[in-house]
């Protein structure tokens, strides 16, 4: 008997597209709505004067997760996407030295010895112990926690020691590395979660392990091509994606999500609703006041959120001699982190990330030119900063710092086009609550069972995907949130869904 159930998805970001792909493959009727003119949400492209930039994510970590999502749709990711493994993965620049980071163990050992002269025993211990942590925790991270019973599982109880509570990532790395700068090489990844390495829970020490074990990839054309590939699968399966279609509100009757109302007034009803919009924004803008009892506007305002970012996308008439990825640490990294997360103030000495993707991918800019992407972590909008007043000053500081730290002293003369996104525009234009680009903070009290559930606990027939639900922020975990919600919906309607326990990638990880 044909499956006639209709799934409405709010947002064509990575989570919404992945869920749409998985569900349309299983015969569900899928309708996705997004306010933008392009698919992808924060994974969409920015196109300017022949230059292409990724709006948000630029690192493809845990490629096996993405591969599995396509496998669950009886497809191969490589038939839709061209993957480019990066070696080195990235360059880290301190005030007094730099290091190229490799997933190749031999090259990595040589670099660590060259730069830190500390030996490589700690690195080997790190790889061995964090492999064990990953194997213990990954099955727990990728399961549903929609009920207390599902939370109190034997797997999680067995894995509790690997949470290393209440240690932070930075402190946890002390068992492997003595030098602070050596630890920074293995804990800056907390930025993927928008957190300080001194606050980020120790379980996330497995993030750098995953980089070193499985590598980092670029996708030809930018990571936005992943969104395009998922949209193609949805179309092949008969699903629909409606762009320039902003949702005004959810249709809620008797405590259940029944559909959506579009801004132009049209209403669409379905059997299940998946929310891929920023969680806190959706709860405060798409749900009428008084409906929610747990995630009220007052409750959401009091929760902890990630940092924000200042983004500078530069179309240049030259190609600089820079690696694909460069991370530059502030000269006083501790103070920089404190200013972002505690003081919520601006500083002249900041850390930043530069993607020079044209070094690896000639499809992103006209011949002889380059698309340069610059990300500067900033306080979220709890800071109260007036970004209209600060925007140009920060831009000038960023360009000055690119010259001082990376040698791009002539960069102003080579800018053909540019776009800026501030913490304020993240909130006003992109509908990111408080401009917190990595959503709710990933502290323990906002993770697992205590993060908004994939089967949303306040509304029947409503499911969540994206960084604001379990497992959390970052492309691989967002894809996992889509898998969890798609599986829950499939089980509800008695449609078979392959379990992650059968995953070839996970078996490989355990080898």
From Swiss-Prot:
Consequences of knocking out this gene: Cells lacking this gene accumulate the colorless C30 carotenoid precursor 4,4'-diapophytoene.
Gene3D superfamilies: FAD/NAD(P)-binding domain
Pathway participation: Carotenoid biosynthesis
Substrates-to-products reaction catalysed: 15-cis-4,4'-diapophytoene + 4 FAD + 4 H(+) = all-trans-4,4'-diapolycopene + 4 FADH2
GO terms under biological process: carotenoid biosynthetic process
Origin superkingdom: Bacteria
Protein keywords: Carotenoid biosynthesis, FAD, Flavoprotein, Oxidoreductase
Enzyme Commission (EC) number: 1.3.8.2
GO molecular function: 4,4'-diapophytoene desaturase (4,4'-diaponeurosporene-forming)
InterPro entries: Amino_oxidase, Carotenoid/retinoid_OxRdtase, FAD/NAD-bd_sf, Phytoene_DH_bac_CS
Listed Pfam families: Amino_oxidase
Residues in coiled coil: none
Family: Belongs to the carotenoid/retinoid oxidoreductase family.
Biological role: Involved in the biosynthesis of C30 carotenoids. Catalyzes four successive dehydrogenation reactions that lead to the introduction of four double bonds into 4,4'-diapophytoene (dehydrosqualene) to yield 4,4'-diapolycopene.
Protein's recorded name: 4,4'-diapophytoene desaturase (4,4'-diapolycopene-forming)
Organism: Methylomonas sp
